[in-house]
Amino acid sequence: MLNKIFYSLIKTIVYLIKYFKLDRFFFDKIIFNIGLKQLIENKKYYSEFTSLQQADLKIFSQNGEDGIIDYILHRLDIVSPNFVEIGVGNYRESNTRFLYNKVHPKGLIIDCEDNLKEKVKPHLNFWKGELKIQQDVITSNNINEILNDHCDFNIDLFSIDIDSVDYWVISKLKSNISKIFIAEFNPIFGPDLEVTVPNIDGFKRNEYHYSNLCYGMSLRALINLMNKKNYYFLGTNIQKMNAFF
């Protein structure tokens, strides 16, 4: 119940920011502090949780990934996780933004959005941590080269959400690339069928199919792929869009 109330509060604050064109940085501080307090409250019950979805809590993530990530890190006793996140947009809603604001670890974020650095920087206190911002279109052909060039640390948390050829990009990653792995899957494909879009250069979901719903991979395809890379499936968020390993 508290998580639902908190989620509604966050949505209301975001709406007010957009509608009245208010100072986002000021309200982001409010969201961060409220979210941190709720996370601390939730942590009291971590020992009683039997599924990831009980930890579901949205602060700066798109859905409830912030809470789930904190829960997994707590279980693994990781305090300051170095991370890579691919597919962050302008970083306002992402899986690692709250994490970076909270403990300021080393991080690398990658997206193809134009003027990425200019869009990301206003939202963060860069002097407190080491965050690299790389503007690139990620494919199965360049993923390892980009990581080799820009990631000079051991990865604790890896997250990918590019609404594209995610399956094929993941397939090129080395096994056990990180302690925690998060990937978006396409719930439209259903939970049982092993489905992915073809590995097309320059794939764009709005051009591949008129519905704009054909992208990524099914949950089953993702689980089977991650099993080959020695990962264990932990579960999904409540919205059943992100899988955790």
Predicted region positions:
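Short amphipathic alpha-helical segments, especially helix-boundary/capping motifs
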Residues: 41-48, 94, 196-200
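A structural signal for well-ordered alpha-helical scaffolds and beta->alpha junctions
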Residues: 6, 62-66, 92, 140, ...
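Conserved acidic-Pro-Pro-aromatic motif
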Residues: 82-85, 98, 104-106, 150-160, ...
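SAM cofactor-binding core of SAM-dependent methyltransferases
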Residues: 56-149, 153
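Short, hydrophobic/amphipathic alpha-helical patches that form generic packing surfaces
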Residues: 32-37, 71, 223-225
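Short hydrophobic/aromatic-rich motifs at helix boundaries and adjacent loops
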Residues: 37-43, 68, 192-196
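A short alpha-helix capping/helix-coil boundary motif
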Residues: 49, 74-75, 200-203
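Membrane-proximal basic amphipathic "stem/tether" segments
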Residues: 1-54
